[in-house]
């Protein structure tokens, strides 16, 4: 799911917003 993927990236980068 794109939402889960974006959330994982956001957590990995430690940013408040997802990185696409």
Swiss-Prot record:
<keyword id="KW-0800">Toxin</keyword>
<protein>
    <recommendedName>
        <fullName>Basic phospholipase A2 cannitoxin alpha chain</fullName>
        <ecNumber>3.1.1.4</ecNumber>
    </recommendedName>
</protein>
<dbReference type="GO" id="GO:0004623">
    <property type="term" value="F:phospholipase A2 activity"/>
</dbReference>
<keyword id="KW-0442">Lipid degradation</keyword>
<dbReference type="GO" id="GO:0046872">
    <property type="term" value="F:metal ion binding"/>
</dbReference>
<dbReference type="GO" id="GO:0016042">
    <property type="term" value="P:lipid catabolic process"/>
</dbReference>
<keyword id="KW-0638">Presynaptic neurotoxin</keyword>
<keyword id="KW-0378">Hydrolase</keyword>
<comment type="similarity">
    <text>Belongs to the phospholipase A2 family. Group I subfamily. D49 sub-subfamily.</text>
</comment>
<dbReference type="GO" id="GO:0005576">
    <property type="term" value="C:extracellular region"/>
</dbReference>
<keyword id="KW-0443">Lipid metabolism</keyword>
<keyword id="KW-0528">Neurotoxin</keyword>
<comment type="function">
    <text>Monomer (alpha chain): Snake venom phospholipase A2 (PLA2) that possesses a low level of presynaptic activity and the same high enzymatic activity than the heterotrimer. PLA2 catalyzes the calcium-dependent hydrolysis of the 2-acyl groups in 3-sn-phosphoglycerides.</text>
</comment>
<keyword id="KW-0479">Metal-binding</keyword>
<comment type="subunit">
    <text>Heterotrimer of alpha, beta, and gamma chains; non-covalently linked.</text>
</comment>
<dbReference type="GO" id="GO:0090729">
    <property type="term" value="F:toxin activity"/>
</dbReference>
<keyword id="KW-0106">Calcium</keyword>
<keyword id="KW-0964">Secreted</keyword>
<keyword id="KW-1015">Disulfide bond</keyword>
<comment type="function">
    <text>Heterotrimer: Snake venom phospholipase A2 (PLA2) heterotrimer that acts as a potent presynaptic neurotoxin by blocking synaptic transmission and synaptic vesicle recycling. Enzymatic activity is essential for the neurotoxic effects. May act by binding in a calcium-dependent fashion to neurotonal pentraxin-1 (NPTX1) and neurotonal pentraxin-2 (NPTX2), but not to neuronal pentraxin receptor (NPTXR). Also binds to taipoxin-associated calcium binding protein 49 (RCN2), a protein localized in the lumen of endoplasmic reticulum.</text>
</comment>
């Amino acid at each position: 799911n794109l939402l889960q993927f974006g959330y994982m990236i956001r957590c990995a980068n430690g940013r408040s917003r997802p990185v696409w």
